A protein has these predicted regions:
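A short beta-strand micro-motif common to beta-rich folds, especially ectodomain repeats
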Residues: 97-109
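Extracellular/luminal low-complexity segments enriched in Ser/Thr/Pro
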Residues: 85-100
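The catalytic-center signature of Zn2+-dependent metalloproteases
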Residues: 274-372
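Short, solvent-exposed loop/linker segments at the N-terminal edge
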Residues: 45-51
Length: 416
């Protein structure tokens, strides 16, 4: 009898224990499980200015995506699963400023992670090499004063490069010009840098042409963001006008004094002729190279270093002494009459503060050595190269979708 009671007692406690164990086991199965963790091997990348490719390992128990790329920072894949390697390629930074991109890795579930890419700025200025095309307009193909020999054009750019890379004062603007080798469709040019075009007239007004919105005139110009266009024809304006040029545009987020806002032109074409116009009467002269270098200065954002009359004007550069051009020309005539056209005094100017200096600046007119730029002019040219939407080469630009909507389409300024 005692044995029977003990057996029943053991059975009772066995049932209780099993119930407790089952309850504990069931609780573990019902409890929410933590989401698998996303692991990124590198959260901060610091590529060098020359550009670099970084290898990042992403670990996750499931699928994930990576986004936030820019035109200069790109992963080799946008999605993956489980453990995978992503190659993040960072292009060369040609600008002096540090730039930052933040990539976001999003898991299928759980918290996302970030990869900050912080690239150092360039240690020296990027060398801009700008292709130049001369559009030679002619009515009579046999007339050598209209359809000019290509040898005249080949000699112009070396003079320009000497001025822009190695001026009299040793200042290097970091820009070179070369004869374009291919047209916009990628076809090799029979004559490098020369595009010969039968035209409706042997001469025309340079001012009317360079401000024209006529479809035929605009179609003549190759894409300004890829070429420097120089259109060569005989001007109907009076003698003494060798060339004129459009001025570049600036940007709203980094404006430059004297230039118009061209944000809209990052996303749409310019609706007028945009070029340098060169008078055929002057392009065959010995000083034509310096004339082109002067007009390229306008094309890259520089103004004249003088005032046209008594009213003080500015070129927005503090290191270029200003002078009264009209008063100088009167004095020059007196010097020529008394001492002849070779007098060294013709190269002297009297600034608006009374200082006397020798004219060497590329943005002056005769009589001048025209063989140097100043540090402030250098800053303006670099600004235009790095920001202007209608200049060849890489620019620092915002997203076109953000800057084109609602902006006006201003015409270009014209300089001679």
């Amino acid at each position: 009898m005692k044995t029977y009671k003990n057996s029943r007692l053991l059975w009772f406690w066995g049932v209780v224990c099993c119930g407790i164990l089952n309850a504990c086991s069931g609780g573990k199965e019902d409890a929410p499980q933590p989401a698998p963790a996303l692991v990124v091997s590198e959260s901060v990348l610091q590529p060098v200015a020359e550009g670099q490719t970084h290898r990042v390992i992403i670990q996750f128990d499931g699928e994930w995506t990576i986004g936030g790329e820019t035109d200069w920072c790109k992963p080799n894949k946008k999605r993956g699963s489980h453990t995978d390697t992503v190659l993040i390629t960072v292009a060369e930074n040609i600008f002096r400023e540090v730039r930052i991109c933040e990539l976001t890795v999003k898991p299928q579930t759980g918290e996302q992670s970030h990869i900050q890419v912080k690239q150092e700025g360039a240690r020296k200025d990027h060398l801009y090499r700008l292709p130049v095309v001369f559009h030679v307009l002619y009515e009579n193909e046999q007339d050598i004063n209209q359809n000019i020999n290509g040898a005249f054009f080949e000699s112009l750019l070396p003079d320009c490069n000497l001025a822009y890379r190695q001026g009299h004062n040793g200042l290097d603007l970091g820009v070179e010009f070369y004869m374009a080798t291919h047209d916009p469709e990628g076809r090799q040019l029979a004559e490098p840098g020369i595009h010969r075009v039968p035209w409706r007239a042997s001469s025309m007004s340079c001012y009317e042409f360079i401000q024209s919105s006529d479809a035929g005139d605009v179609a003549l110009i190759w894409k300004p963001s890829e070429y420097v266009n120089v259109v060569v024809f005989r001007f109907t304006e009076g003698s003494g006008l060798s060339a004129i040029s459009t001025m570049p545009f600036t940007v709203s987020w980094d404006p430059l004094s004297g230039l118009r806002n061209g944000d809209a032109y990052f996303g749409r074409a310019f609706g007028e002729v945009y070029c340098i116009a060169f008078n055929t009467q002057y392009i065959i002269r010995p000083e034509a190279g310096k004339t082109l270098a002067h007009e390229l200065g306008h094309y890259l954002g520089l103004f004249h270093v003088f005032s046209d009359a008594d009213e003080l004007q500015t070129d927005y550069c503090g290191d270029t002494p200003n002078y009264n051009r009209a008063a100088y020309m009167q004095e020059a005539q007196r010097i020529i009459a008394a001492e002849g056209p070779d007098s060294p005094r013709l190269y002297e100017r009297t600034g608006d503060k009374g200082e006397v200096f020798v004219s060497r600046n590329m943005m002056d007119y005769e009589y001048t050595y025209q063989d140097e730029f100043t540090p402030d002019q250098y800053k303006r040219v670099r600004h235009v190269l790095e920001n202007s939407p209608l200049i060849p080469g890489p620019e620092k630009m915002a997203d076109p979708k953000e800057v084109t909507s609602g902006y006006p389409l201003p015409p270009a300024l014209i300089a001679r």
